[in-house]
Regions:
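Structural signature of tandem alpha-helical TPR/SEL1-like repeats
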Residues: 46-50, 78-89, 114-125, 149-159, ...
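Alpha-helical adaptor scaffolds
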Residues: 320, 324, 340, 344-382
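Bacterial signal peptide processing site
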Residues: 31-33
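Bacterial N-terminal signal peptides
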Residues: 18-28
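Terminal, low-structured helical/coil segments at or just beyond the last alpha-helical repeat
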Residues: 419-474
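Hydrophobic face of amphipathic alpha-helices that form TPR/SEL1-like repeat modules
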Residues: 69-76, 105-111, 141-147, 178-182, ...
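Short helix-capping/linker turns of helical repeat alpha-solenoids
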Residues: 61-63, 77, 96-98, 111-112, ...
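Post-signal-peptide N-terminal segment of Sec-exported extracytoplasmic proteins
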Residues: 37-88, 99, 136, 140
Length: 474
């Protein structure tokens, strides 16, 4: 399973320093310095095209930090090919750029299937970047220790985090929150999360998201209202980013965290969406989850605005509407077209394309296409994809049934612990011989090794993407 099985068997804080450096490049370097502010501001509001254009102008003049800015955008696409390019860019700049050291370290922490050598390289880079004054290094370092304890047998993550806390490092508290999330003890430590994040709120705006989560889980509307008031004031002053406001709004609209406050979420998103296009899609998702907030015309307006800003989540959600046929008439061809535009940037796009091809929604079953997309989705962390692959191999629609591969993917799907997955795994295991089961378990382990050992937590992705201040970039 390491390879794909066949279907029948897939502003300028650095301005003065840069002007001095520009003497060795060209006077145009100083003339181009305002572009760094344009790039930073564009990136903060989600306008990656403008950011990329301005970073490119500086990168062409030889500015390593601008090259790192371009790599940041590549990482943000979630496209494996672009992430590979970003890794090479970070690595080339790491000798002279502490920021590149931190970025490369974080990228290696989040890299699926990273080698033990890469784990230790990440540790060294993050420690070096921390010593050079870079922020957002202890959180990914904590994730490294938590995610790959076998690579660091002499490191106790909790003890290390406690040492950081005793030393007074600002990131240490959030590293503790990360430990709670990773070890699934977050709900047992809500009071501690609140204490940590209230203390860090003025310097670390991701704490707005954590506190909003805590107050939703605690059903504490008074505390939540005070937090939102403080956040909106910070947003007006420019100390809280639109990305954070968007994230908090999505917490408010998440019914799995407690009683949702969808109307407040909608009001927050509508305030920031004109300057932060990703929020148009968050608004559409909110309307999808709470249809009473609007109608299909409102939904299409939100999605059109998101698509105009090249937001892949907009293509994904529009594809879902045509796939499900709830808001608009079902149209598998239209769904396919929108999902294809989101492929490489939204993992779920591969999942839905795989389901279209597996279920024959285009008039017939396309088993190899289905497998290719579903396997990509599964390897990128889409929870339901393994179950769909097990169904593909066991049902034999459009292809010959393959009991061994069906068993392998049913075992992988069983990790999701849903009744359907457990039932299918039990059903597919029964007719196999002991030898076949042993072979299947070897293939399961091989596939797990291909994917990496753990799914990425939301906080880990923050650790990869998070920038303390958009102005820091250059």
């Amino acid at each position: 399973m390491a390879g794909k099985p066949a279907a029948t068997q897939s502003r300028s804080h650095f301005a003065s320093a840069y002007c001095a450096l520009a003497l060795a490049v060209s006077l145009a370097g100083c003339a181009g310095l305002p572009d760094q502010r344009l790039a930073n501001e564009a990136l903060k509001r989600g306008d990656t095209a403008t950011a990329q254009q301005n970073y490119q102008q500086l990168a062409d003049l030889g500015y390593s930090e601008a090259q790192v800015g371009l790599a940041d955008i590549q990482v943000g696409t979630r496209d494996p090919a672009q992430i590979k390019q970003a890794e090479a860019t970070y690595r080339a700049a790491a000798d002279t750029s502490p920021r590149a050291q931190a970025r490369l370290g974080r990228l290696l922490v989040a890299k699926p299937g990273a080698t033990e050598a890469e784990h230790h390289e990440a540790e060294g880079l993050l420690k070096k970047a921390f010593a050079n004054g870079e922020g957002n290094t202890l959180i990914p370092l904590a994730m490294l220790y938590l995610q790959y304890p076998h690579s660091f047998p002499n490191v106790n993550a909790q003890q290390q985090i406690s040492k950081w806390q005793a030393a007074g490092y600002p990131e240490a508290g959030l590293a503790q929150v990360l430990l709670y999330r990773t070890q699934d003890t977050y709900d047992q430590h809500l009071d501690d999360v609140e204490r940590i994040c209230k203390a860090a709120l003025n310097t670390t705006d991701i704490c707005y998201v954590e506190l909003a989560t805590v107050y939703q889980k605690q059903a504490a509307p008074e505390k939540q209202a005070e937090l939102l008031k403080q956040m909106e004031a910070g947003y007006s002053r420019g100390t809280v980013t639109a990305q954070r406001v968007d994230s908090v709004a999505r917490v408010l609209g998440d019914a799995t965290l407690g009683t949702p406050d969808e109307k407040t979420a909608q009001a927050l998103l509508e305030k920031i969406a004109p300057g932060y296009p990703a929020s148009w899609v968050s608004l559409a998702q909110l309307l999808y989850d709470f249809p009473e907030l609007g109608d299909v015309d409102q939904m299409m307006k939100y999605l059109d605005n998101g698509r105009a800003a090249d937001q892949p989540r907009a293509e994904l959600l529009l594809g879902k509407l045509y796939y499900e046929g709830k808001w608009v008439p079902a149209d598998a061809k239209a769904a396919e077209a929108h999902f294809e535009k989101a492929v490489g940037r939204e993992v779920a796009a591969d999942y839905y394309l795989g389901q279209i091809y597996r279920r024959g929604y285009l008039g017939k079953v396309y088993p190899q296409r289905a497998l290719d997309h579903l396997l990509t989705a599964a390897r990128n962390g889409q929870n339901s994809a393994d179950f769909a692959i097990a169904q593909l191999f066991s049902q034999g629609k459009g292809t010959k049934p393959d009991p061994l591969n069906a068993y392998v993917f049913s075992q992988l799907a069983k990790a999701q612990d849903t009744p359907e997955a457990v039932e299918l795994a039990t059903q597919l295991e029964a007719p196999l011989t002991p030898e076949q089961r042993a072979q299947g378990q070897r293939l399961v382990q091989q596939e797990l090794a291909t994917r990496g050992t753990l799914a990425q937590s939301s906080l880990q992705l923050h650790a990869l993407d998070e920038e303390e201040d958009g102005e820091e970039s250059l």
